[in-house]
Amino acid sequence: PSHQFPTGVTMPAGRRAELLHWAARAPGRRYIIEDDYDSEFRFDTRPLPSLQGMAGADGPVVYLSTCSRSLAPGIRIAYMVLPRQLLGAWQAKYRLYSGTVGRFEQQTLARFITGGYFTRHLARERTAYKARRDALVAALRTSFAPEELTLRGYTPACTCWRS
């Protein structure tokens, strides 16, 4: 819901609430899978709350994200936040699954996050990506007539169409 690819459209708060209400009407039977892979890269506004954040720990949202966009493409660590009612079943089914990411990498990332380095890193990245995005937008605006170009979105390489 933070933005839809490739259009860059953001799901409005009212629609998010409607979606959560729809899932809540059938508890244990309807779940929303939220793949929030780069919501931390908003430049002009604060990040919007995730559906999982709006629903809470008992809500009907399975939240997925990754560190490959926010840190580096080579850091292939993703994570999932399950509703409490699904956690036991997941642990029972996958208790022997060791994952594909080594413990060293996981522990290094955990220390990076708990030490506050991840938050500082994101602030630097937002500044750098905003500057790059602004330079791209300026170059596009000088290269095309206003009626030929439509720009939308907040992502580092915003969506553009040429008429």
Question: Which residues make up each language-model segment?
Answer:
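Active-site phosphate-binding strand-loop segment of PLP-dependent enzymes
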Residues: 1-43
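Short, solvent-exposed loop/turn segments at secondary-structure junctions
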Residues: 1-4, 38-39, 68-70, 84-87, ...
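Inter-domain helical "communication" segments and dimerization helices
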Residues: 28-29, 114-117, 146
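Short, conserved active-site loop motifs that form the nucleotide-linked donor/cofactor pocket
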Residues: 30, 61, 148-149
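Short beta-strand segments
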Residues: 32-36, 65, 81, 153, ...
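Short, conserved catalytic or adaptor-binding loops enriched in Gly and charged residues
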Residues: 51-56, 142
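Conserved core segment of the aminotransferase class I/II
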Residues: 57-127
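Conserved glycine-rich beta-strand-loop-beta hairpin in the small C-terminal domain of fold type I
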Residues: 110, 130-137, 148-163
